[in-house]
Amino acid sequence: QGTRLYRSRSFDKKPQILEFNDLTSAPYEYAKQNRMSPAGISMFYSSLQAKTNLAELGPTDGVIVTGRFTLKKDVRILDLTSLPSLSYWVKGDIGEMEFLRDFSKEVSRPIDQDDRIHIEYLPTQAFTEYIRYRFKDDNGAPLDGIMFNSSIPNAGKNVVLFCNKEESSEYVDLTDFKIYP
């Protein structure tokens, strides 16, 4: 609760009025495939720093609007950015930790941003669906999202929340936005 998240979107021209719904998760019919979700599945993709969004969005012919959101509640996140080192002396399942480390590398691998269907996304999308619907924490509660490193070197950390356009308002408030020419 209270953590700032940033989400960017490109527009053809500078918008006259901006509202929460303009910057939150895409509606199902416009949700494109992403690292964690196939086309038609809406999730809230964000980062911990505005510069991360700008780096990932890349150059555009129009303007970029970056919204600063604040988490309204505590969320349960699988953090793939700070996994412990593997050691045979540490208690736990080495196989599971090795899988998470490999998955973390895979999800942060650069993939061309175009309109093609990227089969490279299929493993990360399948794992995300498993985490979203089947995985529970020690208290039996589902996870709310995943944090992972940006595919852009040294750009920062991304957070995907498992909430669609309608559910976004339960998780975040839009506190501010900035327009980049």
Question: Whereabouts are the PLM-identified features?
Answer:
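Short, hydrophobic/amphipathic alpha-helical packing segments
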Residues: 47-50, 124
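Active-site and NAD+-binding cores of ADP-ribose-processing enzymes
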Residues: 1-2, 7-37, 60-181
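Short active-site loop/helix that positions an aromatic residue
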Residues: 50-60
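A short, exposed loop/beta-hairpin motif centered on an aromatic-Gly-Thr core
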Residues: 40-46
